[in-house]
Regions:
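Hydrophobic/aromatic residues within well-ordered alpha-helical segments
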Residues: 21-24, 45-49, 69-77, 113
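Conserved SAM-binding loop
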Residues: 14, 88, 106, 141, ...
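Helix-loop "lid/cap" segments that line or gate small-molecule binding pockets
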Residues: 28-29, 48-63, 120, 152-153
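Active-site neighborhood of HAD-like aspartate-dependent phosphohydrolases
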Residues: 1-42
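Metal-dependent phosphoesterase signature
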Residues: 57-93
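Asp-based, Mg2+/Mn2+-dependent phosphohydrolase catalytic module
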Residues: 1-4, 97-100, 113-220
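Short, acidic loop-to-helix structural element flanking the phosphoryl-transfer center
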Residues: 81-108, 114, 118
């Protein structure tokens, strides 16, 4: 089935920031004399900052350190962003250039809060590619709820079923599927479970493979 618009996640899909975020959580926990396990960090991928805090609050060894953990995480993360270039995921520039050449509407759908999302897009020089950016600040419910992607489709004036979402995380892919959209998963830190992979249009090893698939679907 053809498509009319592409919706893209940001962290872990277009820019290589999920590792920075994970390290910020590690550093914040270490400063407080505790630690966050890797399995727990994997569960945070694709969630908004507030959703991350709610998840961590459920862990007794961490709940006692809130809200200091939240504050330190923000400080470490912003410091990392300000002290270096935001690395792009391989293939994202080629993909966005192709979407522009083909005049295919596209928008960002991110669980990051609005001001930080805009900062990341500006620093990574990806902002000019997008007229619409829907963030966690713009909706009542962030991923894995469908609100972000439904809002992005509405801004583009495209029916959800005519959108394809590019996502790296399980939470983000769940949001796309809940919005009745097709999703191509390009895993970053965590591979999707088999049940999720079966529901996806495809699981691609990188953005080059995702672009090739989009080109094939465009030619159908």
């Amino acid at each position: 089935m053809p498509y009319d618009a592409i919706l893209l996640d940001m962290d872990g899909l277009m820019i290589d920031t999920e590792q920075l975020c994970a390290q910020a959580w590690r550093d914040a926990a270490s400063e407080l004399g505790t630690r966050i396990g890797e399995d727990t960090l994997h569960q945070l991928v694709g969630l908004s900052h507030q959703h991350c805090l709610r998840y961590l609050q459920q862990h007794p060894e961490l709940s006692a350190h809130m809200p200091a953990l939240a504050l330190l995480n923000r400080q470490y993360y912003h410091r990392q962003l300000q002290h270096g270039d935001i690395p792009l995921k391989p293939g994202i520039t080629a993909l966005l250039d192709w979407l522009r050449q083909q005049a295919i509407p596209c928008a960002v759908g991110t669980a990051t809060e609005g001001p930080l999302a805009q900062l990341k897009l500006q620093c990574s020089q990806l902002a000019p590619y997008f007229q619409h950016v829907v963030s966690a600040s713009d909706v009542a419910n962030s991923k894995p709820a469908p609100d972000i992607y439904l809002a992005a489709a509405a801004r583009l004036q495209v029916e959800p079923a005519r959108c394809i979402v590019l996502e790296d995380s399980v939470h983000g892919a769940s949001a796309a599927l809940a919005a009745n959209m097709r999703v191509i998963i390009v895993p970053d830190i965590v591979q999707p479970p088999a049940t999720m992979a079966k529901q996806a249009l495809a699981v691609c090893k990188d953005l080059f493979a995702a672009q090739a698939l989009l080109q094939q679907l465009r030619d159908v």
